[in-house]
Curated annotation (Swiss-Prot):
This is PR5-like receptor kinase. Coiled coil: none annotated. Autophosphorylated in vitro. Its main location: membrane. Its EC number is 2.7.11.1. It is an enzyme of class 2 (transferase).
């Protein structure tokens, strides 16, 4: 009797064990990368453990890990790992800090692409997701393997190489190959702001909104978590106790398909007529959509044609040149002045007057050529001593060119570069700063239509024969009707290092002409820093990693002027330098409403130093960069003067400078 009861109880327990799905699983880990990957595991549940917490997978290898019931944890891939002469194991990305291949229950150091699992949770379901909240290092995909009948569970992953599209200031470069990034940081890790990290007053979902950076991640990997309060639907569920295949560097995106098949025979027959109905309706809708699209495209092409043939010339009110004449004036494009994202700039000469000109030939682009229209429409409305003059244009189908006055002394960055043996004197720097401010004030207030430049940087400030500064390159400019104060932006514009914080996140405020004010302030600070780079570099180890504007503010506040301006500065030069610092610090206030308009900037520059107040500290953080120990030779630093901080390329492929002498950004 007892034996029969024991057998029955055992049968019930075993039956429950299998029916409820509480059984061990197999995780098959595959490496399809062109290099070795070291998978790592972190177990969250104390009652269960894995047979290994880390191992090596060479190219093309795979390994099956038996995962116990109710396991909860995460896994990731480590890359570019090595063992030191003392036996310490470390990885450039995803390192868990254990000093060996096994991770010893320690997590991954960001930036790392993460997979989270909770097995046998609510109603016996598995929960799993992929996250780039802590940054990104490797593409991967999770594919559930169905057991028995039922619905096929969803694949999830991030199969795109985000390292290629990573914003330049978030890239982590390898120590051996400094041309190709090996990981992409998240904005919180890079900047440390509450807006990016979702803490403090931004610690609630309603307050912490997606930023430009998290949106970039989301667009590339829509099924992955991109920031702390991302859509909860990115957590996927699966029943029927499946096994899982995790693949690093999957071969194609087809592995991300999400089938949902019913395997019950009766259901197949019942749904066959529904399938035919759906196919028929879909075909009819597709045909209707195609017809509508064709009509829209043809209408748009007709409008574009009208614009191409008539409106450009009517708006610009400038001389229009044929492509043949453009080719002749540049001597068949013989003398290259500079190259950039929008095209190439050549030196030319007008046939009728013999005047030297700069000719920008725009790259062939899809659409209506927004950058061309921006530049022609903007500059045709300007006439100011501190704005480069537009002399004519060419518009022949996909051949587009803009003819400017020639600037023999190149761009401002040439004169404030750390490599220059002689620097501009303080009086000249002051004149340049005033000239730029007058040009911006003219664009913002005294044009028929307000123009916001959105790409103020030293490369876009050209110097004439008398070293008078002239604002150039209006490819990213925006014309504002009725001098509107708030501008609607679909995409961020500008060059990293000079872009106002409200361009990154609406948590800082609205985008407006004050965004140009911020860029202007950063340019002035760079002029000050380049003038005294020796002092900055010799400032001591305590300030070696401090962001330069913050360093200037703290020393200025303490009255330690000589550390900023040097010992040899005269009293008159010191007044100029102080004035430039105060104005620049006012211009880079984080809140746009705290920045002065350009007309006020001119008053501050031309007024008495004693009338200027010291602004609040404009910087809430120091954009220091966390680099793994194995990347100590990396070029990426947080120093203000490192070229990686003021990136020379623009987010929207902004044109480089039109300058004398061949130079590429």
């Amino acid at each position: 009797m007892v034996e029969g009861f024991s057998l029955s109880l055992m049968f019930l327990l075993v039956s429950h064990f299998f029916v409820s799905g509480v059984m061990s699983r197999n995780f098959t880990i595959e490496n399809k990368c062109d290099y070795t990957v070291w998978p790592g595991f972190l177990t969250m549940t104390t009652a269960v453990s894995l047979p290994t917490n880390g191992f090596s997978l060479k190219k093309g290898e795979s390994r099956v890990i038996n995962v116990p019931p109710s396991w909860s944890g995460r896994l990731w891939g480590r890359s570019f790992c090595s063992t030191s002469s003392t036996g310490n194991f470390s990885c450039a990305t995803g390192d868990c800090g254990s000093g060996k291949i096994e991770c010893s229950d320690s997590g991954a150091r960001p930036p790392t692409t993460l997979i989270d699992f909770t097995l046998d949770a609510t109603d016996g379901q598995d929960f799993y997701d992929v996250s780039v909240v802590d940054g990104y290092n490797l593409p991967l995909v999770v594919v559930p393997q169905r057991l028995g009948s039922g619905r096929t569970c969803s694949n999830v992953g991030c199969v795109v190489n985000l390292n290629k599209t990573c914003p330049s200031e978030l890239k982590v470069m390898g120590s051996s190959n400094k041309e190709h990034p090996i990981a992409c940081m998240n904005a919180c890790q890079k900047f440390g702001l509450p807006e990016f990290c979702c803490y403090g007053e931004y610690g609630k979902p309603a307050k912490c909104q997606p930023t430009l950076y998290s949106t970039n991640f989301k667009n590339e990997c829509p099924l992955a978590y991109s920031y702390a309060y991302d859509n909860e639907n990115n957590t996927f569920r699966c029943s029927n106790s499946p096994n899982y295949v995790i693949t690093f560097c999957p071969n194609d995106i087809s592995s991300m398909s999400q089938p949902s098949k019913e395997t019950n025979g009766g259901t197949k027959q019942k749904s066959s007529w529904k399938l035919k109905l759906i196919v028929g309706v879909s075909a009819a809708l597709t045909l209707m959509i195609l017809i509508v699209v064709v009509i829209i495209v043809r209408t748009k092409n007709m409008r574009n044609s009208e614009w191409n043939d008539q409106n450009v010339e009517a708006v610009a009110m400038l001389k229009r040149y044929s492509y043949t004449r453009v080719k002749k004036m540049t001597n068949s494009f013989a003398h290259v002045l500079g190259k950039g994202g929008f095209g190439t700039v050549y030196k030319g000469k007008l046939a009728d007057s013999g005047r030297d000109v700069a000719v920008k030939i725009l790259k062939v682009s899809e659409g209506n050529g927004e950058e061309f229209i921006n530049e022609v429409a903007s500059m045709s409305r300007t006439s100011h001593v501190n704005i480069v003059s537009l002399l004519g244009f060419c518009y022949e189908k996909n051949k587009r060119a803009i003819i400017y006055e020639f600037m023999p002394n190149g761009s401002l960055d040439k004169y404030i570069s750390a490599n220059m043996s002689t620097k501009m004197e303080w009086e000249r720097l002051y004149d340049v700063a005033v000239g730029i401010s007058r040009g911006l004030e003219y664009l913002h207030n005294r044009c028929v239509t307000r123009i916001v430049h959105f790409d103020i940087k030293p490369q876009n400030i050209l110097m004439d024969e008398n070293l008078c500064p002239k604002i150039s390159d209006f490819g990213l400019a925006k014309l504002c009707k009725n001098k509107e104060s708030i501008i609607s932006m679909l995409h961020m514009r500008g060059t990293f290092g000079y872009i106002a914080p409200e361009m990154f996140s609406k948590n800082f405020g609205a985008v407006s002409h004050k965004s140009d004010v911020y860029s202007y302030g950063m340019v002035v600070l760079e002029m000050i820093g380049a003038k005294n780079i020796e002092k900055v570099e010799y400032s001591g180890s305590n300030n070696g990693s401090m962001y330069f504007p913050e360093w200037v503010y703290k020393d200025f506040e303490k009255g330690e002027i000589t550390r900023i301006f040097g010992d040899s500065i005269t009293d008159e030069e010191e007044k100029i330098a102080k004035k430039l610092v105060l104005v620049a610090l006012w211009c880079i206030q984080m809140n746009p409403s705290d920045r002065p308009p350009m007309i006020k900037v001119i008053e501050m520059l031309e007024g008495n130093l004693e009338a200027l107040q010291v602004p609040p500290n404009p910087l809430l953080f120091s954009p220091e960069e966390t680099v793994p120990d194995t990347l100590e030779d990396s070029d990426d630093t947080s120093t203000f003067f490192n070229p990686s901080h003021f990136e020379r390329g623009t987010l929207l492929d902004s044109e480089d400078v039109l300058q004398h002498g061949s130079r590429s950004s």
